């Protein structure tokens, strides 16, 4: 753990690993916290494997956090949102973001790979979200080594630019 001069945690080295039925769940990360807040920058390796899916994320993540939220309250809001229909969840999430009650993952630079429902994926790139947590820009190379540049409007509508490479 890292502590500031006031004795408050400011980040640290986090690691965990456990066997689960048909696989494992593990991660290790180097985290840096916002003042009196949870992590907002972390370098990480995360892996999950069970009988249905497997995946690995390696990269750098940046989270935009309000100055005054409480982690327990934020977790409770996310838990409540998961139980709502999509439209209601999206409205509550947007309202909570606007009111500074929850955080937003803004940037991921790294590699995501695995298999879900029999489909393989391996996307390495830069993934940027807007301040409301919606996709804004994705610049990545996919499983078949095909480069992608995807741009989204504020409502999340995709405007896709595909790079045509000579064969």
Where does each model-flagged region fall?
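Parallel beta-helix/beta-solenoid repeats that form elongated, surface-exposed shafts/blades used
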Residues: 1-167
